């Protein structure tokens, strides 16, 4: 569980417009299964009314480019996948994340690997890292599951990694699958600064 408190406010000039961002530091109530969890911060955009909002893709890219005090900045979006295993299809809580996410969390795979930068490109993003529980229940805890294909939203994804049993992210959701978050340059909606759907960690 996180208690979010304001750490500091960062003013960043983007073109002719000055954007004000509130940087939130995660304070640990219960020890989280990450290395140096006290160094993980959640970044929000603050609207004129002072309310925290998620972040648009162009804003995330600005922050990532301009970041000076953070070693890495990652974006993620929570989703539900439709998983077609051996039984009836079921919803699987998931996350689409930039490859930097596991770097920010200093998290390594229990089996296989996490994402590589090349998998943030549309067309190269059909890989998945699964939770230890998913691997046990759905894939028989078989090490040979690495390299196998599973169906998420009727699309084949190659299993490249299994996370450790204690790994949770986000901690408020029982996430079972992580896939790369690739930004399509042809997606005009995604290129809008008004389309705020990302959570940023650094």
Language model features by range: what are they?
Residues 12-39:
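Alpha-helical transmembrane segments
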Residues 42-45, 58-116:
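Short amphipathic beta-strand/extended segments in non-transmembrane regions
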Residues 1-8, 12, 16:
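Membrane-interface helix starts
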Residues 46-51, 86-88, 164-166, 202:
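Structural beta->alpha junctions
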Residues 80, 93-117, 126-202:
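Mid-to-C-terminal secondary-structure elements
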Residues 1-5, 33-35, 46-50, 88-91, ...:
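Membrane-helix entry/capping segments
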Residues 21, 53, 90, 95, ...:
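Residues that recognize and position ribonucleotide moieties
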Residues 38-39, 70-72, 155-158:
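Loop/turn elements at helix/coil->beta-strand transitions in domains of secreted/extracellular proteins
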């Amino acid at each position: 569980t996180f208690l979010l408190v304001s750490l500091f406010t960062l003013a960043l000039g983007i073109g002719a417009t000055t954007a004000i961002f509130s940087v939130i530091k995660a304070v640990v109530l219960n020890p989280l299964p990450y290395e140096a969890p006290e160094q993980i911060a959640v970044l929000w955009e603050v609207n004129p009314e002072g309310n925290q909002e998620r972040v648009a893709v162009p804003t995330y890219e600005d922050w990532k480019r301009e970041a000076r005090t953070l070693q890495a900045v990652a974006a993620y979006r929570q989703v539900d996948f439709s998983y077609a295993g051996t039984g009836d299809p079921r919803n699987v809580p998931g996350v689409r994340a930039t490859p930097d996410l596991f770097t920010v969390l200093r998290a390594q795979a229990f089996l296989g690997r996490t994402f590589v930068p090349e998998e943030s490109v549309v067309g190269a993003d059909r890989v998945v890292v699964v939770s230890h529980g998913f691997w046990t229940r759905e894939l028989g805890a078989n090490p040979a599951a690495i390299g196998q294909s599973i169906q998420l939203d009727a699309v084949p994804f190659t299993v490249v990694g299994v996370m450790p049993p204690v790994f949770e992210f986000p901690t408020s959701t029982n996430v079972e699958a992580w896939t790369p978050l690739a930004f399509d340059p042809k997606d005009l909606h995604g290129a809008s600064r008004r389309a705020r759907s990302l959570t940023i960690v650094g």
